[in-house]
């Protein structure tokens, strides 16, 4: 089960109405309101044998209550998609993002203090208008600090109707965008390879999602950290929870051998 939203951490249910009007609600409505960490816990308790994910979290709204709820329940995946967009405060301000580099890094530290091996993924926009080489280096250094498990990286392009598209000239040459994007991707691949290598030899609980694209003799699924795991099909099928011993890896995929069926509570 995936709890999905553009910004799931801003979820607040108090019987109906907009979040901005919460202070106008009755005392009873406010006292019985449900925020995202509470919703996540309710779902985890209701479906103990169902794997639960959520996405996406915005850094300014991500609370440590959510992280503590993740840590408390084995059926909540230990992965947070936490878009940062840039490692430069100057560019973040130009993007109208509501977090700074320092606030983001502090959030990462706090997440890992609660769940040390929590997988963290990112979105990154490269070549935003007026991005300097120093801004680009700030992005690379942030990536080295966080060491993301995986990410989604794109070069900037004008989008009609956006504030940037209306007010900022797309003034970074495409060749320079491509160069910087390649450097960002290289850093991400290095960190992804490190994370997958660290899982070799471990036993992972894998939820089978389908047949491997490379061979019908293999199945693929994801572990508790949202990493793709491929293993021989044998008698297992889509929807099974399988204990898989990881024997090898690529930069983005874990390879293994099935041991047995398993349960999230085991």
Feature names for model-found ranges:
Residues 1-133, 144:
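Conserved SAM/AdoMet-binding glycine-rich loop
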Residues 6-8, 156, 234:
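Short, ordered loop/turn segments at secondary-structure junctions
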Residues 82, 123, 143, 151, ...:
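Hydrophobic, well-ordered secondary-structure elements that form the walls
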Residues 134-178, 184:
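C-terminal, non-catalytic macromolecule-binding modules
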Residues 51, 79, 150-155, 253:
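Residues at the N-termini of beta-strands
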Residues 164-266:
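Terminal RNA-binding accessory module
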Residues 66-67, 139, 231-232:
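Short beta-alpha junctions and helix-cap segments that line functional grooves
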Residues 37, 41, 105, 137, ...:
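Generic alpha-helical structural signal
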